[in-house]
A protein has these predicted regions:
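Phosphate/pyrophosphate-binding catalytic cores of soluble transferases and nucleic-acid-acting enzymes
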Residues: 1-312
Length: 312
């Protein structure tokens, strides 16, 4: 936790695995401490995907001011650096109003950018980046990943072969700066060093989380508006490498539309993907959020009291 002396510059971070109840708790907290919520989920930034990405409900948006939700087009990339810049501006404006910024989400890289800062990697031209992408497209992701690990062994076990965006970024950084992306990451500092940053992680037991995931998946997929928004998204036919394609459920619903799986299989496959994602989030938190306060209680009222105690 940050120093308690900077009460007028307090920022609260709330993270946890998907479906752990972050959004609901953050709204309760914001109402209690006069706060405003800032999105820290990389899939909830998109305008076109609201229901499938579990963006806050309209009722919650009316209760508390929310920032950085549904503002970005799925047709373009949006980097961690761009997000951080917007967050800093948002946080400053919220504090100026005498309120408390509450960052809520499950994207580990977003929170790492807030707590540790971003590396100052020299700009790499679009021509060079496109040249790297051509190599990737030509040889495929498996061979390209081997090429990355060969040139930059520090990436092994840190970047998944299937994470196209990060694989390409790591490769181009190593090739054109002669330094690993992880060497650059060593020389970073947080833009929020002068703030009182409180870090809360919702540490929900796995068996309870799986029930929550299952319930949420059924509810989302039963909503015809969800299927309609995915249909509209697919009609945009965006470039495959764009991050929005990785929103859980897109591929599965597409397969359902094409008659390649039943509705029952759709629910099960989305559940599997969501459980896998939750596991990755938990693994990330154990490695990168070691100084975060982990809270949990079976009773939501007790959980809220624990969080309130940590941020007061």
């Amino acid at each position: 936790m940050g120093s308690k002396s900077n009460n007028n510059k307090k920022i609260i971070l709330i993270s946890g695995p998907t479906a752990s109840g972050k959004s609901k708790l953050s709204v309760l907290l914001a109402k209690k401490i006069n706060g405003e919520i800032i999105n820290a989920d990389s899939m909830q930034i998109y305008k076109e995907i609201s229901i499938l990405s579990s963006r806050p409900k309209i009722t919650d948006l009316k209760k508390v001011k929310h920032h950085l939700y549904g503002f970005q087009s799925v047709n373009s990339k949006f980097s961690v650096g761009q997000w951080l810049k917007k967050v800093k501006k948002c946080a400053i404006n919220i504090i100026k109003k005498g309120k408390v910024p509450i960052l809520v989400g499950g994207t580990g890289l977003y929170f790492k950018a807030v707590t540790s800062g971003l590396s100052r990697i020299p700009k790499i031209s679009n021509n060079k980046r496109e040249a790297v992408k051509k190599i990737y497209d030509k040889i495929g992701y498996k061979k390209f990943y081997k090429k990355l690990i060969s040139s930059d062994p520090l990436c092994k076990n840190k970047i998944l072969a299937s994470d196209t965006q990060r694989v390409l970024r790591a490769f181009e950084v190593k090739r054109f700066t002669k330094k690993s992306i992880y060497e650059w990451a060593k020389n970073t500092k947080s833009d929020f060093k002068e703030y009182d940053v409180r870090k809360i992680y919702l540490n929900i037991p796995r068996e309870k989380l799986l029930i929550k995931i299952n319930d949420r998946t059924k509810k989302i997929l039963a909503d015809q508006k969800c299927l309609k928004e995915v249909k509209n998204f697919l009609n945009l036919n965006i470039i495959k490498s764009l991050p929005a394609n990785k929103i859980i459920g897109i591929t599965e619903i597409k397969s359902f539309f094409e008659g390649r799986q039943t509705y029952k299989q759709l629910i099960e496959n989305v559940n599997i993907k969501t459980r896998q994602y939750a596991k990755r989030q938990s693994t990330w938190s154990r490695g990168h959020m070691t100084d975060w306060v982990r809270v949990y209680s079976d009773k939501s009222s007790n959980l809220f009291k624990k969080i309130l105690k940590e941020v007061s």
